[in-house]
Amino acid sequence: MSDLISYDDVIDAAYDIFLEMAPDNLEPADVILFTAQFEDRGAAELVETGDDWVEHVGFDIDKEVYAEVRIGLVNEENDVLDDVFARMLISRDPEHKFCHMLWKRD
């Protein structure tokens, strides 16, 4: 296996992919909200990889190779990312690029 990409690079890649795909996968109001408030409240956070990903992708997840990133808006009162616009599973292996996103649905 090749060297895994850093968690910082995973977050950057996830955010770039999110920005590219958000207009096609989120409600227009959510895109406007995220764009308007990202400067003050936006976040892309690495979180513990959820055990539910196998249900979404159909294969077992090696938590050393795959990382989960959540992208959304932080609640200013408690500094918690509680308005999640997307969850992304992304491979850290540069030889086997993969990502799968779960989008916010109203």
Curated annotation (Swiss-Prot):
Pfam families according to UniProt: DUF440
Gene3D superfamilies registered for this protein in UniProt: dsDNA mimic, putative (3.10.450.140)
HAMAP family reported in the protein's UniProt record: Put_dsDNA_mimic
Family to which the UniProt record says this protein belongs: Belongs to the putative dsDNA mimic protein family.
NCBIfam families, per database record: PRK05094.1
Function, as annotated: May act as a double-stranded DNA (dsDNA) mimic. Probably regulates the activity of a dsDNA-binding protein.
Protein name (database record): Putative double-stranded DNA mimic protein VIBHAR_02752
Organism: Vibrio campbellii (strain ATCC BAA-1116)
